[in-house]
Amino acid sequence: MGWWRKKKKPKSEIASERGAKLLKDLIECCDGKSNPIKFFSADEIRKATNNFGVSNLVSELSHDFDYKWYSGKNENHDMILVRKAFSQSVYYKDTFFRDIAVSSMVSGHKNFLKLIGYCLEFEEPVMVYHGVKKHYHLESSEQPWKRRMKIAEDIATALAYLHTAFPRPFVYRCLSLTNILLDEDGVAKLMDFSFCVSIPEGETFVQVDYIAGTVDYLKPNYLKHGVVSEETDVFAVGHSMQMLLMGEKIFDRIMRRPFPTSKFMEEPKMDEIADPEMGEISEEELCQMKAFLLLSLRCTGHVGEVPTMVEVAKELKSIQRCLHNDTFSPSVETQFDSHQDISSSVILSNQTKDTRALLRCIACHVFDEMFQWVMMNWFRFFRRNRRIC
């Protein structure tokens, strides 16, 4: 009686069909030119992960409902990370292949999770990444202020690379803090390019049919009309910066609920906005936080002109270097030119401590005036137009 049942395709045929789809995405994204990646067989994956054994499960990374992460090793790598999707529904319209294609293009950059290879023989998509001693999901509440700033800079640098390193800009479009991993050194790494899209040459945007991402992080014209541009990522970075600064509880209190007091509306204070998990805030950190918040508001279009992602990354570097850490040195892996920044750093390092202190005082005074005006208008705006999620 089972004659009517649909016959399952052999694994080799499934892998062949998927390989053709992957090749199509590789050609579309990078003309077939990308960093070398390896095709793993199902047997190789099982052997590397002890057949997806419980002892190999990376609990720190496996809290979401989309993937399970496993540690492993093979003859070529002492440590690998294997990401296995729960079901193919996670990858809407074969976005698994887009993830592989874009990951292979950017895996040489320090702020992206490095892809080693993939396996097309399982029913669920499997990707293999370079492993380090420790990878863990970003929990902003556990991070000190200095680390939060560095995380924001890492992500802005990664997205600036996506926007500028290739003949056509690539837009990540579904950024959220859950797509960011930290390694043992606290370096932020972006992953999962399933919904990444490229902007055609000569164009500034592209329109998509499927809206992907977390609502709070989505620019209004993308959420309503499916318009994707570089500013889609800039908006998401601005929102991420606000989350890093305020923490989830404070952000929810400000954005989603009636404001606690009229005094808070008329005289907004940084210590009422900053995440209390960060503990005591110094004067230097207060100045940084104000500059950080103002930059985030530019990213989300609430203050001044929306910056490019390259400008966001540069400003985040400046906020850290000039107001806090005189020894900060730009990364050689950034796509933009840092010569001027390096020169400024050398000049500043040759000045006296008194001069630096004076500059900080002037900067703080300017930020105080600007901050008070901006915050009052920002809170009033959200009081009238609270977003419905």
From Swiss-Prot:
The UniProt record lists the keyword Nucleotide-binding: yes
Q: Which stretches make up the Protein kinase domain?
A: 41-342
Q: What happens when the gene is disrupted?
A: Slightly shortened inflorescence stem when grown at 25 degrees Celsius. The double mutant zed1-6 zrk12-1 exhibits short inflorescence stem and autoimmunity symptoms when grown at 25 degrees Celsius.
GO BP annotations, alphabetical order? cell surface receptor signaling pathway; defense response; regulation of immune response; response to temperature stimulus
Q: What are the protein's UniProt keywords?
A: ATP-binding, Nucleotide-binding, Phosphoprotein, Plant defense, Receptor
- Pfam families the record matches: Pkinase
List residues modified as Phosphothreonine.
T214
Q: Which InterPro entries match?
A: Kinase-like_dom_sf, Prot_kinase_dom, WAK-like
Modified positions (Phosphotyrosine) are Y129, Y222
Induction info reads: Induced by elevated temperature (e.g. at 25 degrees Celsius).
Could you say which residues bind ATP here?
Answer: K47, A48, T49, N50, N51, F52, G53, V54, S55, K84
Q: Name one GO molecular function term.
A: protein kinase activity
Q: Which family does it belong to?
A: Belongs to the protein kinase superfamily. Ser/Thr protein kinase family.
The free-text function statement in the UniProt record for this protein reads:
Together with RPP13L4/ZAR1, involved in the regulation of the ambient temperature-sensitive intersection of growth and immune response in the absence of pathogens.
| Free-text domain note | The protein kinase domain is predicted to be catalytically inactive.
Q: What is this protein called?
A: Inactive serine/threonine-protein kinase ZRK12
| Source organism per UniProt | Arabidopsis thaliana
What gene is behind this protein? ZRK12
